[in-house]
Structures are given as C-alpha cells and as structure tokens.
C-alpha cells in the first residue's frame, strides 16, 4: 500500500531483513520499538509463551478462484482457516490468472515464526513475569501483537502504532520518559 511504501522509503528508516534483534543492539539507538515476541526478547528466560503459527499452501488458478480478496473458513471440517486471493487487493489491474494462498494454523514450535499469541488463564503467571520485567525497562517500548502478547486485528495494530508515535513525540517534547507499553497489557 502507499502507506507502507512511504514508511519504508523514508530517509530516516532503514529496512533490514533476516536480522534478529540482540540486546547489544539497544545501545545503538536512543529508543527501541520492539514488535517481536515478548518472551524472545528475554531469550525465553522464564519459559516459552504459547503462540499459533501459519503454514501457507499456494494455489495457482487460470481463472477467478473465490471472487473476493479474503474468505475465512470457520468449520472444523475444513483444515485451513483462510484463503487469500491477491488480485482482488488491486481491482484496477487486470489478471487472467490468480494466485491464492490457503492458511493453515497450528501450534507454534520453537523454530517456527509466531503469528498469534495464545492467552490462556493457566499461563498468565508466565506472561506476568515477562510483563513485570518489561515494564521496568528503559528506552524500549513493546508494540504490536507479539510485543504486547495480545491478539490484534490489523486496524487496531495500525491505530495503536499511530498512538504510540504520538506518545513518543509528546515524551520527546515534554522531556519525559517513554513507557515500556503505551497500551494496557
């Protein structure tokens, strides 16, 4: 989208791919906004929090596949949770063929990419250890789904990112300390 393009092309932003954050990197910046997994930030010192991950299956089709960009599947009889047909994200373009992806959700293992936090009552003690430690941090703010360990839809994620930017700019202007979380966790 134009919003993402303007962010990644901004002169003050450098995008680095396939590079994991390390604690040593914190000294390179005045303030860090961390959107990775909260437990991973602390090298899972207290244990791993629970996440769901996704596997994707690509479908190539020489026609229209489902007639819309995203179709969610909530039936226990269907093994995937969603199909995304990307050509519908840009309806002004004409495409003969279509590329779709089926999304399969499963429990996240140690080497998987976490997508969705799984907050469970029986795991709150573990989460609270990480939250308590994070709230004591200086010069870092935990953001997004993984950083705040909450399920968030994208519209809420973007709204919270904008709110966090406002809080940060206000803290700079008023010379106040930026909190570790700008939302209730």
Language model features: what each stretch is:
Residues 8, 12, 37, 42, ...:
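Hydrophobic/aromatic-lined pockets within catalytic cores
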Residues 7-22:
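A conserved beta-strand/loop element that lines the FAD pocket in flavoprotein oxidoreductases
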Residues 17-18, 30, 51-62, 69-70, ...:
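C-terminal lid/capping helical subdomain adjacent to the catalytic/cofactor pocket in oxidative enzymes
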Residues 7-9, 77, 136:
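Short, structurally constrained coil/turn elements
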Residues 19, 23-129, 133:
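Mid-domain catalytic core of redox enzymes
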């Amino acid at each position: 989208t134009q919003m993402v393009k303007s962010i990644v092309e901004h002169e003050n932003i450098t995008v680095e791919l396939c590079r994991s954050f390390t604690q040593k990197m914190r000294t390179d910046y005045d303030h860090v906004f961390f959107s990775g997994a909260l437990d991973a930030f602390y090298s899972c010192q207290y244990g791993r929090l629970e996440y769901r991950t996704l596997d994707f299956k690509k479908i190539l089709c020489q026609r229209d596949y489902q007639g819309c960009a995203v179709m969610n599947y909530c039936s226990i009889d269907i093994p995937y949770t969603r199909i995304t047909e990307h050509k519908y994200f840009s309806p002004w373009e004409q495409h003969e063929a279509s590329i779709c992806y089926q999304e399969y959700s499963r429990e996240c293992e140690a080497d998987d990419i976490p997508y969705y936090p799984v907050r469970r009552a029986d795991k709150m003690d573990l989460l609270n250890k990480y939250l308590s430690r994070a709230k004591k941090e200086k010069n870092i703010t935990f953001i997004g789904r993984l950083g705040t360990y909450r399920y968030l839809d994208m519209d809420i994620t973007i709204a919270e990112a904008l709110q966090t930017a406002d809080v940060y700019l206000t803290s700079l202007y008023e010379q106040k300390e930026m909190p570790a979380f700008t939302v209730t966790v």
